[in-house]
Design a protein with these regions (language model features):
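Cyclophilin-like peptidyl-prolyl cis-trans isomerases
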Residues: 15-246, 251-253, 259-278, 285-288
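Bacterial N-terminal signal peptides
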Residues: 1-14
């Protein structure tokens, strides 16, 4: 009888542990320690799909500085560029200024059960409605005024002491931006490892989410000379897309502009200043 009770108790504990571990988790390894987040892939599927595919390097993204389409782990080596004591820690900005991302944006995703109701909430940073990209933050306290403004997609389940440590990193006022939450030395995300437990988590494919997330792709273009002697570049524009023109004289340093929607621009003034240039066009499709 005692043996049966012990076996039953062990089975119940095992099932309880299994249910607690089931899900999709992101393990952050930083230079300040390790912490683990649970990702809400059932209630915020598109936001989680974006984060997971960037973290594991399965989704192409645009290196805005070099004008390269990359498909490699996005967050490795990036810092927490914002440390707002008692509020949030924020990361996911390649240039460390908080004004960039993966080259595309996607829409907000709100769920009535997902709220900024405690410390350790994982949520998307944005520059206004429907401007999500790669930047995220983790709360250091309840922040209910962020509900329905920022998309919650996870929470810290292990390592809150590391989050608290990150939240106490010394900061200074940024000399150019004037922000008072710039870390003297930004803590670094060394890697993010994704772990799946359970059937639903294993079935979740971030590349087969519906509606699909925006794509980064090269644009086919053609250069031609008009009867008036103007050198122009033309391409087939895609409605709603953000289309980039990158130019370089040495293949090392690139400058970029956002292309106009009409699908044709003059290169004359550029080529008068730089007779030999390399150019490439890249597109971020619109979020459906």
């Amino acid at each position: 009888m005692l043996l049966s009770s012990l076996i039953l108790h062990w089975i119940m504990l095992a099932l309880q542990a299994q249910s607690q571990e089931a899900g999709l988790h992101a393990i952050f390894q930083t230079d300040q320690g390790q912490f683990t987040t649970e990702l809400y892939f059932e209630r915020a599927p598109r936001t989680v799909a974006n984060f997971v595919s960037l973290a594991e390097g399965s989704r192409p993204w645009l290196d805005l500085e070099e004008g390269k389409i990359r498909q490699e782990p996005y967050y490795n080596g990036l810092g927490f560029h914002r440390i707002a004591s008692g509020f949030v820690i924020q990361g996911g900005s390649p240039n460390g200024l908080g004004n960039d991302g993966p080259g595309y944006t996607f829409k907000d995703e709100f769920h009535p059960d997902l709220r900024h109701d405690s410390a350790g909430i994982l949520s998307m940073a944005n520059a206004g409605p429907n401007t999500n990209g790669s930047q995220f933050f983790i709360t250091l306290a309840p922040t209910p005024f962020l509900d329905e403004v920022h998309s919650v997609f996870g929470r810290v389940v292990e390592g809150m002491e590391v989050i608290e440590r990150l939240g106490n990193v010394p900061v200074v006022t940024h000399p150019l931006l004037g922000k008072t939450d710039t870390p003297i030395t930004a803590p670094i995300i060394q890697s993010i490892t994704l772990e799946r437990q359970g059937e639903l988590a294993n079935q979740f494919n971030p590349l087969k989410i519906s509606p699909a997330l925006p794509r980064i792709e090269a644009i086919e273009s053609r250069i031609f000379l008009t009867a008036q002697g103007d050198i122009r570049v033309a391409w087939d524009p895609l409605l709603g897309a953000k289309e980039y023109f990158y130019a370089s004289t040495d293949m090392q340093n690139w400058s970029s502009i956002i292309l106009p929607p009409q699908g044709e621009v003059s290169l004359m003034s550029l080529m008068q200043s730089y007779p030999i240039i390399m150019a490439k066009l890249i597109r971020a499709t619109a979020d459906p």
